[in-house]
C-alpha cells in the first residue's frame, strides 16, 4: 500500500518571491447562518455583477451546503460555486465524490470543491468517530474525490473508510472537479500541496498568515514534484466596505472578536498581531461575549485581520495579500454596514482595481 506518512519530514525552507500583479479574481464567501433565500439572492448578485466565485460554507447546523450549491449552480450562468468546505466525517468520501460529480453536471466547469476536517466543529458536536485521524481522513477524501471525478479507481488503499477495489463512478463529470482543502496547520498545508488543487484559508486570515501558508503549500508541492503556482491559494478575507470609513470598520469588530477568541493559535501567531491586544479581546469575550470583545478591539487588530473602510481603503488593504501569494481573495461575511451596498461597491470599485486583466 502506498504511504504518504513518510513525507512528514522536518520543515523545508522555501522562499516565495512574488510581485503584486493583481489577483486571479475576486469572490464572495457567504455565511451559513442566513436563510437559503437570502444566500441565493447574494449568489445571483455575484453572478450578475461579475465576481469570479462564490463560496458556500457548511459551518454549524444551519444549512446543508449541497442542496444550496445545487440551486446556486442551476440558477446562475457564469460564476464559479465553491463548496467551502464539507468534511469527510459527516459524509463518506465516495458520497462526496458522487455529490461533486452531480454538482458538476448541474454547472459544468463552474464547481470548486472544498474539503476539510472541520475539527473544532466535529468535536463540538460530539461527532468525532472513535480513533478519528482528521489529517488522514481529509487526505484520503481529497484523493478519493479527485480520482473518482476523473473517472478513475482509487490508486491507494484507504484506512479511514472502506471501498471495493476498482470502484468507479458510473457517470463521472466531463472533466475532473478541482478539490481544495480547508487547511490551517503546517501539516495540512503541506499535504495539500502534495495532493490537492489548492487551499482555502478560512475564518480570519492576515497577510502574515497568508505568506506562511503559501510557503508551507510550496513545501508540499515540492515534495510531490508539483509547481505551487499551478495550485490556487484562496482565503476568506474579512471585508467591509462603505462610504463611511468608521462605520465600515466597526462592522467587522463583533465577528472579529468572535473568531479571535476561538481561532487556532497559528492563525494569530503568524499574523504578527499585538499579543496584548489579542489577549484583551479574548478576556472580554470570555467575560461578556462578542459585543464586549468588540468594544475593546483595537484599530490595529482590524488592520491585521480585515480589509475595511472605503473602497480605496479596501483596495489598499488587499494589495499586500497579493504580494504574500494569495491568488483569490474571498470577501467574507460582512461586506459592509449595508450588505447590498457593500457587494455593489466591491463589484464596481474594488474588483476592477485588484483583478488581473
Give residue ranges: language-model regions.
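Active-site-adjacent structural elements that line small-molecule/cofactor binding pockets in enzymes
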Residues: 13-357
